[in-house]
Amino acid sequence: MIVSRSATDEAIARPSTVTIGVFDGLHLGHQSIMRAVVDRAALNGTTPTVVTFDPHPRSILYPESAPPLLQTFEQRLEGMMFLGIRQVLAIPFTLDIAALSAEEFVERFLVDSLDAKAIYLGRGFAFGRKRSGNIDVLRRMSVRFGFEADEVGEVELRGRRISSTATRQALQLGRVNLARRMLGRPYGVEGLVTEGRRLGGPVLGFPTANIEPRSRVVPDRGVYVTATLVDGVWYRSVTNIGIRPTVGDDDRQVGLHAGTEEAGRRRGEHLAVDELVERAEGDPGELADV
């Protein structure tokens, strides 16, 4: 997959079929947009392309209220590639970019840089200065520049629009099953194995590992039945997020029992944990029985 951070990058493939957005989480709504782009690109012989922003625009415009992210930038790229996207133009978001009118943005990035033949927006998406760009602006500009412009409808779950905000809220409330349905996959916490208090064997009676989460949104405090990836093998595991009431420690942490001693030996290495099912908190003995 081609990943460019400059509109003048000579590696950019043209012509293209394009969508625009941050796409944090790559939930089912985002996936619907990606499928539309990939399908259209296959028909018109162009490169399926995503124009995105890094960092998140709100972290520049409204840093005090910027949302925690569901994915790292690298995780978003991996997901896009899996969905069939073959090119990403990741625009470094700055106040200068925010000051561009919708028309300037389209002409500079979508027309001049990517030679877009078709542009898809998610319903309600806006771009450009004061969020002035929308599907109506694109359709008006399409007459001049000769591209198609279309809007992809929302995806709903139980009558509620699926969005990155709704997914974050579900996770922050510990509703990992709801988040899984909105994402179309389990939500994973990925991070470095860190030094713990070495209580796994002598006190708890089973091997444990502590990780420092790499993902920005960590589910609410609780005990979750999970799966942990160690050396390319998934192990059933139990993960505790939050305080450690069983050992009298109030620090927020992510600790897991992965059914293999290898997890705890990987200090300084990455582990991936997929959140599957929430269950009630219990004492160490109860966790050992899962």
Which stretches of residues belong to each language-model region?
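N-terminal catalytic cores of NTP/NDP-binding nucleotidyl/phosphoryl-transfer enzymes
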Residues: 9-72
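Residue-level signal for inorganic ion chemistry
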Residues: 27, 80, 119, 179, ...
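Glycine-rich, highly charged phosphate/nucleotide-binding loops
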Residues: 68-76, 100-106
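A glycine-rich helix N-cap at a beta->alpha junction
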Residues: 75-87
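Classical nucleotidyltransferase
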Residues: 96-206, 229-231
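Phosphate/ribose-recognition catalytic cores of enzymes acting on nucleotide-derived substrates
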Residues: 196-274, 279, 290
